[in-house]
Design a protein with these regions (language model features):
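Conserved N-terminal entry element of GNAT/NAT acetyltransferase domains
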Residues: 1-28, 138-139, 150-173
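Conserved donor-binding loop and adjoining core beta-sheet/short helix segment
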Residues: 6-15, 22-110, 224-234, 240-243
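Acyl-donor-binding surface of acyltransferase catalytic domains
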Residues: 78-163, 298-302
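Conserved acetyl-CoA-binding loop-helix of GNAT-fold acetyltransferases
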Residues: 93-108, 242-244, 248-265, 270, ...
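Conserved hydrophobic beta-strand within the GNAT/NAT acetyltransferase core sheet
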Residues: 117-120, 237, 271-275
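Flexible, substrate/cofactor-facing loop regions flanked by secondary structure
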Residues: 152-235
Length: 303
């Protein structure tokens, strides 16, 4: 098979990569480490940075591998300065070799020592992990835990809130301001409302699943965005957080229960979430709310 690689050309390449991720999921759900939701978020935020701030450097951090008919077979992406995602079909896993070569060459262009490049894998892709070992990479001790919850065959969950607290979706600029205040308090992430409007154009964005939980005084107490692919009947929570002063009151559990109930009404069969291995409270929350650990997403660097 004749295969060639090329750089990013236009916005349609992002749609094609998103389609590749979804196609591979239907073949082998756990082969690639990048979920459709996290890719949608990443791509829309980059388009937002481009439109709002004129930032285009991210375009040079994408490489695509295609057959002679320009069907996409694989892609390599620097998600940020040093974190790399590689996407392939299982039948085209051999492309991971030239992809890795490109990653290291691009890292040199970015003035990154090989030891600084961090490559993410799914532990359900042993070929990729063995390849990295053979090339002198070693696994970091920390990892993400990927969890899933089955939404079929069950009744709606109880949404238990303290008196006066309410859950709603973001429906106004005031709601969005409260949400962004929450993400800054929890994750130290000061979001931009103009970029967020572009983020909302993602194919997996559903307005009714962009949730905030408010105190009786109207303060942001907890929040959670859920991304839904109707064709896959799969959703993902990202992000989820509770403002420090409102923790230990069951608000995270209530918001997740409400989100799962809304997903059931949309016909969603499964929802996922990820948490860092050392995030004790987050892992307890997801375990308590019915998310079962499925796999680890590992990170590799050169020795």
């Amino acid at each position: 098979m004749e295969i060639q690689s090329r750089g990013y050309q236009d916005q349609s390449d992002l749609s094609t990569i998103g389609s590749l991720i979804r196609q591979v999921y239907q073949i082998d759900a756990y082969w690639n480490s990048w979920s459709f939701a996290l890719f949608d978020i990443w791509s829309q935020r980059n388009l937002g940075d481009q439109e709002v701030f004129g930032m285009t450097e991210w375009q040079h951090n994408i490489r695509l591998w295609e057959d002679r008919n320009r069907n996409l077979l694989g892609a390599a992406v620097f998600r940020d300065r040093d974190l790399v995602k590689l996407i392939t079909f299982p039948d085209h896993k051999y492309l991971l070799v030239p992809m890795l070569d490109w990653v290291e060459a691009r890292g040199h262009q970015k003035a990154l020592p090989n030891q600084k490049i961090k490559i993410e894998t799914s532990e359900h892709n042993p070929f990729f992990e063995k390849l990295l070992l053979s090339q002198g990479y070693e696994k970091d001790p920390g990892h993400y835990i990927y969890r899933e919850k089955d939404l079929t065959g069950g009744q709606n969950e109880l949404v238990i809130l303290p008196t006066g607290f309410t859950i709603q979706h973001i429906d106004s600029s005031d709601d969005l301001e409260k949400f962004h205040h929450g993400t800054k308090l929890v994750f130290n992430f000061p979001d931009n409302p103009d970029i967020y409007q572009i983020l909302r154009l993602a194919p997996s964005f559903v307005p009714e699943l962009d949730l905030i939980l408010l105190s009786p005084e109207g303060q942001i107490a907890s929040f959670g965005s859920i991304w839904f692919d109707q064709r896959l009947s799969l959703a993902e929570f990202e992000p989820v957080g509770t403002v420090p002063e409102f923790r230990k009151r069951g608000l995270g559990s209530a918001l997740i229960a409400e989100g799962c109930n809304r997903l059931r009404r949309l016909g969603c069969r499964k929802v996922s979430v990820m948490s860092w291995s050392e995030s004790v409270e987050a892992n307890r929350l997801y375990q308590r709310t019915g998310f079962l650990p499925i796999l680890k997403k590992n990170y590799w660097r050169r020795r």
